[in-house]
Regions:
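Non-catalytic signal-transmission and effector/linker regions of two-component phosphorelay proteins
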Residues: 1-16, 22-23, 82, 86, ...
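Acidic catalytic/metal-coordinating carboxylates
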Residues: 44, 71-76
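Two-component/phosphorelay signaling modules centered on CheY-like receiver
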Residues: 22-40
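Conserved phosphotransfer cores of two-component systems
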Residues: 53-56, 79-86
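Active-site residues of response regulator receiver
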Residues: 64-65
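Hydrophobic/aromatic residues positioned on beta-strands within the core alpha/beta folds
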Residues: 92-93
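Acidic, metal-coordinating helix/loop segments flanking the phosphotransfer/catalytic sites
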Residues: 41-60, 100
Length: 124
């Protein structure tokens, strides 16, 4: 698992989970909320962008790389880093870390399957 240093830890605020698979959405939401954090869910990057432009309380984004829609998770991560540099970004994929070679600076990567306790610690 490759996880570069994070630039921000959301002690408060919402973790936006961007995932197109319902079971992964439900599980990630439950685990992150069980850790005492608030969540929102988006099914793709386009929905995530709509949420990010309409809210100012999102502190972190946890996104899959491979998703349907107009952009993948890497493109979403790059946009977030440019437009909202204060938002922590964590990306995930079932592919090997080379898939995440295009990670923007300050973005962490978790390869699926990941340990939820390690993931939750990224947001504390």
């Amino acid at each position: 698992m490759f996880a570069p240093p994070l630039i921000r830890r959301p002690a408060a605020g919402i973790v936006l989970i961007v995932e197109d698979h319902l079971l992964v959405q439900i599980t990630a939401t439950a685990r992150i909320e069980d850790a005492g954090l608030s969540t929102l869910v988006a099914g793709d990057a386009d929905e995530a962008m709509a949420i990010l432009t309409s809210r100012d309380d999102v502190a972190a984004v946890f996104t899959d790389i491979d998703m349907p829609g107009s952009m993948d998770g890497l493109a979403l991560a790059a946009i977030i880093r440019r437009r909202w540099p204060q938002i922590q970004v964590v990306v995930t994929s079932g592919q090997r870390p080379s898939k995440a070679a295009g990670l923007p600076d300050g973005v962490a990567f978790f390869q699926k399957p990941y340990d939820y306790s390690n993931l939750v610690n990224q947001f504390r």
